[in-house]
């Protein structure tokens, strides 16, 4: 029977969500990641029958004076301390951010009272970083722009600077700080503070005198490096030009030497027999070399026989046959 009455009450509550009710002031609540937050209800003026809690229109719990009668699955994260109607949400996550609503029902009031909250879950801030954006040194005055930042930029983070060392402490709002320091002035410590609704964090102090001295040293070193680079570039360019000139000169020298040798060879080979080069016919008469024992004699006579080109008729030939005779060595020219 009790379970049936609870169901009837819960059904009536859902039906009354659409009814226009008196609303309280919207409250903003900030919670740290993995931390906890309490949505407080101050309802001492009226007699409360029950309170219904919702998150972005999702039902969370219904609380009566004698305890919780119905609750969603987040029982380990949602509690109602001291038996009151206020709700405590622990183990916060980023997706817990959103709108929370408490509807208060009383028999003494015809309309329900509504209290709304907006929860934002933030991370704890890390140590801020200080970077040098721009620096200059003119007329003995060193001007440096410092910028402070954290890993949680954009999550409702505000920045401020605190300067300690020159009389009273000075404060500057904003992430960027421009300072001017002259040689001989008293140094000061500059500290950046980053803050969000759940935490604040401080940077490591920086000192303008050291920054300016380091900047001057770096500038001198940079100039020295630039001079060295320029001198090296000039030397390299000179070496390249010298190599090109030397290579071109060697090639031209070899060409002139070859031309000179060619001319000298042409002059050393004169035309000794120009009359033989024109219409020169060369006849080669083959001959057969025969050796006989008589060739070894010390006194050998050679006869040159010229055979005339005479053609005799057959009638003039002698009738007696020719008898072969031995001849000495003959060379026919």
From Swiss-Prot:
Region (Interaction with FYN when phosphorylated at Tyr-282): 276-294
Domain Ig-like C2-type span(s) in chain numbering: 128-203
GO biological process, one term: innate immune response
Chain positions carrying an annotated carbohydrate: 42, 95, 139, 145, 156
Motif ITSM mapped to chain: 300-305
One annotated Gene Ontology cellular component of this protein: plasma membrane
Disulfide bonds: 142-212, 148-192
Expression sites by tissue: Expressed in spleen, lymph node, bone marrow and testis. Lower levels detected in thymus. Expressed in NK cells, B-cells, natural killer cells and activated T-cells.
Keyword Disulfide bond attributed: yes
Residues recorded as bearing Phosphotyrosine in the entry: 282, 302
Extracellular side: 23-224
Signal peptide range: 1-22
Gene3D superfamilies: Immunoglobulins (2.60.40.10)
Entry keywords, A to Z: Adaptive immunity, Disulfide bond, Glycoprotein, Immunity, Immunoglobulin domain, Innate immunity, Membrane, Phosphoprotein, Receptor, Signal, Transmembrane, Transmembrane helix
Subcellular location: Membrane
Sequence intervals crossing the membrane: 225-245
Database matches in SUPFAM superfamilies: Immunoglobulin
Bilayer topology annotation: Single-pass type I membrane protein
Note: CRACC:CRACC interaction between NK cells and resident Kupffer cells contribute to Poly I:C/D-GalN-induced fulminant hepatitis.
Record text about domains: The ITSMs (immunoreceptor tyrosine-based switch motifs) with the consensus sequence T-X-Y-X-X-[VI] present in SLAM family receptors have overlapping specificity for activating and inhibitory SH2 domain-containing binding partners. Especially they mediate the interaction with the SH2 domain of SH2D1A and SH2D1B. A 'three-pronged' mechanism is proposed involving threonine (position -2), phosphorylated tyrosine (position 0) and valine/isoleucine (position +3).
Self-association and partners: Interacts (via ITSM phosphorylated on Tyr-302) with SH2D1B, PTPN6/SHP-1, PTPN11/SHP-2, INPP5D/SHIP1, CSK and FYN.
Job description of the protein: Self-ligand receptor of the signaling lymphocytic activation molecule (SLAM) family. SLAM receptors triggered by homo- or heterotypic cell-cell interactions are modulating the activation and differentiation of a wide variety of immune cells and thus are involved in the regulation and interconnection of both innate and adaptive immune response. Activities are controlled by presence or absence of small cytoplasmic adapter proteins, SH2D1A/SAP and/or SH2D1B/EAT-2. Mediates natural killer (NK) cell activation through a SH2D1A-independent extracellular signal-regulated ERK-mediated pathway.
Name used for this protein in its record: SLAM family member 7
Naturally occurring in which organism (per UniProt): Mus musculus
